[in-house]
Amino acid sequence: MSENRIRIATRKSPLAMWQAEFVKAELERIHPGIVVELLPMSTKGDVILDTPLAKVGGKGLFVKELEVAMLEDQADIAVHSMKDVPVDFPEGLGLEVICEREDPRDAFVSNIYKSISELPLGATVGTSSLRRQCQLRASRPDLIIKDLRGNVGTRLAKLDNGEYDAIILAAAGLIRLKLSERIASFISAEESLPANGQGAVGIECRTNDERVKALLAPLEHLETRYRVIAERAMNTRLEGGCQVPIGAFAEIDGDEMTLRGLVGNPDGSEIIEGVITGPKTEATQLGVALAEELLSKGAKSILDAVYAKA
């Protein structure tokens, strides 16, 4: 492999392509003269669009094909939305860089209403996320929640066609695709705790590829890494995939980190919450400790029931 060339495996969706183009531009800015190629490909999660994600099953629905490309030396790196990245990596691959986080909140999108509280009784809301569903149902049990799949453009088109009164999307994706004007309101973390890693972009590569690791190093954002590592550690201890009713959100103030976590029954009947504060340098330990607290409050029975239905 030329010292001056790097190949990026990416999903084909507009948001995934934005993320890959962002990393490409950063590499070109930091390393003038470098040649960066994009290798768009489809993943299982992109192909199976007629089934709720929780029922498709498995971890890594949106990353496996990209990982195979790296292991077979067809690509050097893969760029991921961190909330799609499984907790375990195939032997020989690892998460090398976590880039600076975009807004991690959920966004309320509607052509008629300004916020969840404005929705009339029995309104129809679209979201494919069990995490969002359980929090919505807990606060508004009257709402009709329908599954919503496809890329951002497809989801917005379904809203515009009148299939839903409102939909819930990650704010980061809309901001990155220059669709901020579609956001009727941002949903606070208190109202809808985000998914672990939401809004962050991660870069995976071969663990023994020192050339690529050196090229990627300047893209690392340490504060984002601390936050995402804590959130992922909690998720790992809970044995959660990317399609489970788990929320995790870390914030940093100076050297202190506050991590909030949530496990909920998708029907909204029970939500178990916890919060922990400690040194940001102990991100992994904080995540594990919070998971243990949630498990001690009964989170395992909720998650076991979800996995049994999937």
Swiss-Prot record:
**The entry's keywords:** Porphyrin biosynthesis, Transferase
Record's InterPro entries?
HemC, Porphobilin_deaminase_cofac_BS, Porphobilin_deaminase_N, Porphobilinogen_deaminase_C, Porphobilinogen_deaminase_C_sf
Give the disulfide map: none
Specify the superkingdom.
Bacteria
Matching Gene3D superfamilies: Periplasmic binding protein-like II (3.40.190.10), Porphobilinogen deaminase, C-terminal domain (3.30.160.40)
Q: Which Pfam families match?
A: Porphobil_deam, Porphobil_deamC
Q: Which reaction does it catalyse?
A: 4 porphobilinogen + H2O = hydroxymethylbilane + 4 NH4(+)
Residues carrying S-(dipyrrolylmethanemethyl)cysteine:
C242
The coiled-coil segments of this chain are: none
Answer whether the UniProt record assigns the keyword Membrane to this protein: no
What cofactor does this protein call for?
A: dipyrromethane
Which miscellaneous remark does the UniProt record hold?
Answer: The porphobilinogen subunits are added to the dipyrromethane group.
General function of this protein = Tetrapolymerization of the monopyrrole PBG into the hydroxymethylbilane pre-uroporphyrinogen in several discrete steps.
Quaternary structure (record): Monomer.
Q: NCBIfam families under this entry?
A: hemC
Name under which the protein is recorded: Porphobilinogen deaminase
Q: Which organism is it from?
A: Shewanella oneidensis (strain ATCC 700550 / JCM 31522 / CIP 106686 / LMG 19005 / NCIMB 14063 / MR-1)
